[in-house]
Amino acid sequence: MPQPTSSVTFSRREKARLRLASQGLTIRRWESAEDVARAFGVMQGQDLHSVRRSLSLRAKDHSDAENIVRGYPMRNTLFAASIKDIGWITELCAKGRKGDTELRAGVTKLIENPLSRAELKERAATALPDVPFWHVVRVAMESGHAVYSGADQLITPVDLPGLEETFNGDKVAATAELMTRYFRTHGPATLRDFAWWA
């Protein structure tokens, strides 16, 4: 029976080659940009141009790139993901803060249609003057109400499929799915690596 990856020892060179292959950098493993995003679950997305380059390195076709959105699904960090996945991953991994529940209703009212950051900042300054703007954006995205989308990266209200719609509310199944995607695209890796990443 094969041993789990965590108990196998690789040289640095072997590990590097295996990771390049699992990340789709030696051959193109996926047809489209959305296929890449779905395979990874989420990809670091702070720098929009870098994440777009990362997707284009791994896919043959980019016509479905509009299905890639950005939000805050985990680790208080901006990630890119498929519109089909960011909702359940956010619900599974985002950690709410005290006071966010009360703030959510006010933030939701601010974003009824796609807005630029400047437009949302202006609305938030009037409606929620005591709340830092970055917190408004994060609450909107961590609650699954909005994502950055489109060529202009507008803050866009969305109705995302969550854990209930995708996994019948089963967090164990959702965690197993996210873990499977992680190991297939980041391996060789350990359970500790996954726990840090998620």
Residue ranges and their predicted role:
Residues S116-A125, L191-A195:
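A short acidic, leucine-rich amphipathic alpha-helix
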Residues L103, S116, P132, A174-T175:
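Short amphipathic alpha-helical segments
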Residues A59-E66, A127-V139:
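Short amphipathic alpha-helical interaction segments
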Residues T26, K84, D130, R192-D193:
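Acidic, low-complexity intrinsically disordered regions
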Residues F133-A198:
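Loop-centered beta-sheet repeat module
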Residues M1-L115, E122:
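Phosphate-backbone binding and catalysis cores of DNA-processing enzymes
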Residues L110-I111, L120-A127, T166-G169, R181-Y182:
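Flexible, glycine/proline-enriched loop segments at strand-loop-helix junctions
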